[in-house]
């Protein structure tokens, strides 16, 4: 979903950078965030720290994870938006296919994004748990 249907880079970048700042690390750029997305929250944290060539204990990374998640779950769809043309594409595909979404984002957050983006209407009802 993220990176294919929804441009969520800005919301992920904000959550990531707030987390890095909170724990005393340097933030990353919009360009750099592209290389960390797709591995989940812990993957984002690990890659962000690796970019800076710094190490953190597992306990520190867990604290960062919880901080990131507590912010992100409240701000999962602030700057995110469907990519141009996605709604029209889904509308056309919906006529001949049953559509579903696969995401490594938590189910609860996926549902919020689908609802707020107005993409839920294009999915097969059985695919939205």
Where are these regions (language model features)?
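Hydrophobic alpha-helical core bundles mediating ligand binding, dimerization, or RNAP-core interactions
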Residues: 16, 20, 37, 41-45, ...
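Metal-dependent phosphoesterase signature
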Residues: 50-87
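Alpha-helical substrate-recognition element adjacent to the catalytic core
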Residues: 22-52, 58
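Short beta->alpha linker loops
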Residues: 36, 40, 81-85, 105
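Active-site neighborhood of HAD-like aspartate-dependent phosphohydrolases
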Residues: 1-35
């Amino acid at each position: 979903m993220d990176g294919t249907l929804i441009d969520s880079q800005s919301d992920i970048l904000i959550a990531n950078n707030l987390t890095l700042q909170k724990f005393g690390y340097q933030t990353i750029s919009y360009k750099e965030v592209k290389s960390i997305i797709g591995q989940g929250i812990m993957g984002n944290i690990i890659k962000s720290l690796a970019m800076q060539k710094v190490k953190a204990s597992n306990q520190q990374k867990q604290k960062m994870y919880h901080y990131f998640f507590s912010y992100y779950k409240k701000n999962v769809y602030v700057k995110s938006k469907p990519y141009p043309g996605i709604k029209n594409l889904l509308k056309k595909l919906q006529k001949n296919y049953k559509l579903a979404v696969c995401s490594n984002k938590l189910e609860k957050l996926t549902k919020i994004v689908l609802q707020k983006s107005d993409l839920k209407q294009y999915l097969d009802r059985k695919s939205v748990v």
